[in-house]
From Swiss-Prot:
Gene: murD
Protein name per UniProt: UDP-N-acetylmuramoylalanine--D-glutamate ligase
Entry's Gene Ontology cellular component terms: cytoplasm
E.C. designation(s): 6.3.2.9
NCBIfam families in the cross-refs: murD
PANTHER family to which the protein is assigned, alphabetical: UDP-N-ACETYLMURAMOYLALANINE--D-GLUTAMATE LIGASE (PTHR43692:SF1)
Pathway: Cell wall biogenesis; peptidoglycan biosynthesis
Binding locations of ATP: 114-120
Enzyme class: ligase
Length: 453
C-alpha cells in the first residue's frame, strides 16, 4: 500500500488526507502544533484510519519508512528543511490543489491570483457563471478546499479557484482555461525572500493558462508584464486609451459602461461595491465571464445582485450616524491603503496585528489625509505608533485589543464628527487570532452586540 504524508492539519490538509485514504493510500498527517482542537481532530481522523502526529516537524530521518508522496498545506514553507530533504530524495512533493487538479483536470478551471482583490473577483466570477445556469464552484484560498470539492462528488461545469502564492509554490502542473492576475505589490516577502521570487511564483499560474487576464491599472503588472505574454487580455478603469495593447483584447470603462472590445456589457451604476479597486475587480470578472462564454444578460444580472464578501469593506451596522466597516482582509499596507481610499473622510481607523514587511509610506500618507484618529491593536501597535510619530501624526492611541478598540472608536467618532469606523489592520492576524476571518468576526460581534440594538 503506498504511503502519503500530509503536512498541516488544516482544512486543506485534512481534505487531502481523506481523499488519499479513500483511494487506498496509507495516510499520515502531521502538524507542528498540539492544541485541544487538534487533539479532537486527531481522534476523529484516527477513526477514519488516518494516523495523526501532533507536535511533529516533518523530517525524513525521523521516519523509518519514507513516504511515497508528500502533500503540503499552504501554511508550510516550501523551503522548509523536511521538504527540501524530500525533494532531494526524489519523493514527489505537491500541494493540496495539485492533488485536486489530478482529479478535476477534465473540467475547465479559472485560476485567480494576485496580492489583493482575489476573493472578491473569485466570488463575482462564480456568481456570473452560476447565474448563467452553470455549476461553477468557488474554492481554494476562498475557504473551500479543492480536495473537499473532489470528495463531494458533486456535478461540476467549472472550477473557480482562488490561488495564493503559497499554494502556487507547490502547484507545478495546473493549466487553467483562464488565469487572472489581479494586483501585485510587495507582500509575503518573509516567505518568498525577494519581490522577484514572489512575482515568478505568481507567474506560474498564467504561464500554463490558455487565456490570461491582467489588471492594466496595476503599475507593476503593466510595466513588467506588458510584453511578456502577447496574448494577454488587459483591463482598465481609465478607458480604451489606457489599455496597453488596444481594444482587441481589452475590457474597459467608458461612458458609464463596462465594455468588452467595443460592446457595452453592464452599466457601472449597477455595481454596488465601494472603491476604485472594486471597479478593477469588476472588470477582471467581466473579462473572465466573456472568455468563458457567459451571456451578457447573466453577467449583468450577477453584477446587479452581487453584495460583496465578508471581511472586504463589509458594512456591519450604523449607530448614531456612524457606520462600522469590517475590512479585516486588509492584511498588508497596500490593501489597507485601498480600504481608506474607498471610504469618505473623516475616518476612525483600527489597525494593527502581526506586522509584515513592505512599504508603508502611501498607507501613512492616506492616514494623514483621511483618518481623524487611529486606534492600534496587537503586536504591531508600538511599531505603528513609532511610524506615525515619524510622519508627524499624533492622533493615535494604543488600545491593545479589539474589545477596547470598538467602544473607543465610537467615542472618537462622536468627538471628531467621523461617519466611519474602519477596521483595516494592514497586518496579519496571527498574534491574536487564528485567521483574518476570526478577527473580522470578533469585530462584527462586538459592533453588533453594542450598537445594533
Amino acid at each position: 500500500m503506498p504511503h502519503a504524508h500530509i503536512i498541516g492539519l488544516g482544512q486543506s490538509g485534512i481534505a487531502a488526507a481523506r481523499l488519499l485514504r479513500r483511494e487506498g493510500w496509507q495516510v499520515t498527517i502531521s502538524d507542528r502544533n498540539s492544541t485541544p482542537t487538534l487533539v479532537e481532530q486527531q481522534q476523529r481522523l484516527d477513526q477514519e484510519g488516518i494516523d495523526v502526529l501532533l507536535a511533529h516537524n516533518f523530517e525524513l530521518d525521523r521516519d523509518s519508512h519514507p513516504p511515497d508522496l508528500v502533500v503540503v498545506s499552504p501554511g508550510v514553507p516550501w523551503q522548509g528543511a523536511g521538504l527540501v530533504q524530500a525533494r532531494a530524495a526524489g519523493i514527489e512533493t505537491i500541494g493540496e490543489i495539485e492533488l485536486a487538479w489530478r482529479h478535476l483536470q477534465q473540467f475547465p478551471w479559472v485560476g485567480i491570483t494576485g496580492t489583493n482583490g482575489k476573493t472578491t473577483t473569485t466570488a463575482l466570477v462564480a456568481a456570473m457563471f452560476q447565474t448563467a445556469g452553470l455549476k461553477a464552484i468557488a474554492c481554494g484560498n476562498i475557504g473551500y478546499s479543492v480536495c473537499d470539492l473532489v470528495l463531494s462528488e458533486q456535478a461540476i461545469d467549472w472550477v473557480i479557484a482562488e490561488i495564493s502564492s503559497y499554494q502556487l509554490e507547490s502547484l507545478p502542473r495546473l493549466a487553467p482555461k483562464i488565469a487572472v492576475w489581479t494586483t501585485f505589490t510587495p507582500d509575503h516577502l518573509e516567505r518568498h525572500g525577494t519581490l522577484e521570487c514572489y512575482r515568478e511564483t505568481k507567474a506560474v499560474l498564467l504561464q500554463q493558462a490558455e487565456y490570461k487576464v491582467l489588471n492594466g491599472d496595476d503599475p507593476y503588472l503593466r510595466q513588467e508584464l506588458s510584453d511578456r505574454w502577447p496574448e494577454v487580455w488587459w483591463t482598465s478603469c481609465n478607458g480604451r486609451a489606457a489599455l496597453p495593447h488596444g481594444i482587441e483584447r481589452g475590457i474597459y470603462l467608458e461612458e458609464g459602461w463596462v465594455k468588452v472590445q467595443e460592446q457595452p456589457i453592464v452599466p457601472v451604476s449597477s455595481w454596488k461595491m465601494p472603491g476604485h479597486h472594486n471597479l478593477q475587480n469588476l472588470l477582471l470578472a467581466v473579462a473572465v465571464a466573456h472568455l468563458g462564454g457567459i451571456p451578457v444578460a447573466a453577467i449583468a444580472e450577477a453584477v446587479n445582485n452581487f453584495g460583496g464578501v465578508p471581511h472586504r469593506l463589509e458594512p456591519i451596522c450604523t449607530w448614531s450616524g456612524i457606520q462600522f466597516i469590517n475590512d479585516s482582509k486588509a492584511t498588508n499596507y497596500d490593501a489597507a491603503e485601498t480600504g481608506l481610499v474607498a471610504v469618505p473622510a473623516p475616518v476612525i481607523l483600527i489597525a494593527g496585528g502581526q506586522a509584515k514587511q513592505g512599504d508603508d509610506r502611501r498607507w501613512l500618507e492616506m492616514i494623514q489625509t483621511k483618518a481623524a484618529a487611529v486606534l492600534l491593536i496587537g503586536a504591531a501597535a508600538n511599531l505603528f505608533a513609532q511610524r506615525l510619530q515619524e510622519v508627524g501624526y499624533d492622533r493615535y492611541e494604543i488600545v491593545e485589543t479589539m474589545a477596547n478598540a470598538v467602544p473607543r472608536a465610537a467615542e472618537l467618532a462622536k468627538k471628531y464628527s467621523a461617519n466611519i469606523v474602519l477596521l483595516s489592520p494592514a497586518c496579519a492576524s496571527f498574534d491574536q487570532y487564528k485567521s483574518f476571518e476570526q478577527r473580522g468576526d470578533d469585530f462584527r460581534q462586538l459592533c453588533l452586540s453594542r450598537f445594533a440594538k
